[in-house]
């Protein structure tokens, strides 16, 4: 499976979801977010699968994240964001694949009777601090406004990592934690004209080696989203559509590049944020429209994100 940047970093766009278009900008907040990602495929070629009478749909991976996130303004132009997920990853295969491969070491899930493995636990914490480089606000509410924020971050190894020196490289990508400190850099630019606007985000993560000599590949995410503001009394709705692009270099294990790792994917994003006084509800659906993966990997079928947050001074 291609290990791209953690989705919980980007679902919030490292600025309390859609920073710059939400009415809670420059206010402290805390919230919960749920992510669901569905994959299909395995580290076998199409020819190998065909020989066994199988296809990639006989193999699945489901990733779920339950994320607690917060943002805090210690001073006017500095925003600190923190994110801590609980991760539940499940991979498995159909009975047909289990019989064809002679798998006996997988557990049997009694609900769907598919061989599976489960990896769960607290994930790695992410801390990011962004500084407001500029904020040009039009005196006319119907005019043009824009701003730029940028700053560093760090991914802290708080997550569970259940591997050993003999583990296969692909097992690291399923773990809740990576076991290494990974520096980051983040940038966001927001522009608005009347009730319409756009946002451009970019985040870079540098992979570092853990004690098992595994290092995730360096990763970058760039996304562009357009939105429109709609108001009814105390309610505010921001529907949005955009494109998310993610790219990752190959992982490194014992100083060797991992063949079935890294690559790039592009997602179509459709979402909406609903605000009522101090509360915000978000939902988004992301569908892959382009992929270029190295080797043989499970492919993402879709991503679903929902969340609820509360704002306070």
Mark where each language-model region is.
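Short loop/turn motifs that connect adjacent beta-strands in outer-membrane beta-barrel proteins
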Residues: 18-27, 77, 135-147, 195, ...
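Hydrophobic, lipid-facing positions within transmembrane beta-strands of outer-membrane proteins
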Residues: 28-30, 64-68, 123-129, 148, ...
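Residue-level detector of the transmembrane beta-barrel scaffold of outer-membrane proteins
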Residues: 29-33, 79-81, 128, 149-151, ...
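Surface-exposed strand-loop-strand hairpins of Gram-negative outer-membrane beta-barrel proteins
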Residues: 37-65, 166, 173
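Outer membrane beta-barrel transmembrane domains
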Residues: 43-45, 52, 211-313
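Outer-membrane pore/translocation modules
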Residues: 89-203, 208-215, 313
